[in-house]
Design a protein with these regions (language model features):
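Active-site beta-loop-alpha junctions enriched in small/polar residues
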Residues: 21-23, 49-51, 75-79, 116-119, ...
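Glycine/proline-rich, positively charged
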Residues: 40, 86-174
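N-terminal binding-site loop/beta-alpha segment at the start of enzyme catalytic domains
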Residues: 1-74, 136, 142
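Active-site mouth loops of central-metabolism enzymes
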Residues: 16-30, 79-96, 122-126
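Structural motif corresponding to the early beta-alpha repeats
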Residues: 51, 65-92, 117
Length: 174
């Protein structure tokens, strides 16, 4: 496997990562085998932006014993609950519940890369700030629960706007 070193963090990140949306359809046993095979092939970066909460316990069961070898990317604001369909939220209490649930299901006490999820309009960012979500995430980072905070958007202009609004150019850089 080829790797890139993140110059800001020192993390060695595989050039191939694994997304998770289709994993639960294969079933827990096949899903775990897929993750184990990916790890054996040197893949160490796993993106947990998914429409199905069932992938989280599969990851927890398959990779908890090798947690130090993998990098998890989760998405804050993606709202998961067992057996419920995916939703998106800027509500602080919902984000807190979702983060706690994800940590529990992944059988870990930290998240490597946490993305503020699906920021596509200026109002989305404003709600994150006004609702206290950004402050909560920064508290998690200070506690070591989240190593790095980033932003997920489909709108490049919004990414530039958020970076300008936060007033700290390095705030969201890995």
């Amino acid at each position: 496997m080829e790797y890139r070193v993140n110059r800001r963090t020192g993390d060695r990140i595989s050039v191939l990562g694994v997304g998770t949306s289709g994993l639960p359809a294969a079933g827990a046993k096949e899903g775990a085998a897929t993750l184990e095979m990916a790890l054996e092939q040197g893949i160490n970066y796993f993106d947990l932006a998914t429409a199905d909460s069932a992938c989280f316990p599969i990851f927890g069961a398959a990779l908890a014993g090798v947690r130090k070898q993998v990098l998890y990317q989760v998405h804050f604001g993606a709202n998961y609950a067992a057996g419920k369909p995916y939703s998106w939220t800027t509500d602080l209490e919902a984000v807190k519940r979702s983060v706690a649930w994800q940590l529990e299901q992944l059988r870990t006490d930290y998240i490597d890369y946490g993305f503020i999820h699906c920021m596509d309009e200026s109002g989305d960012w404003r709600r994150y700030v006004d609702n206290g979500v950004l402050q909560y995430l920064e508290t998690l980072k200070a506690q070591g629960v989240v190593r790095h905070i980033g932003l997920s958007t489909h709108t490049p202009a919004l990414a530039r706007e958020v970076l300008a609004l936060c007033g700290q150019p390095n705030r969201f850089r890995f």
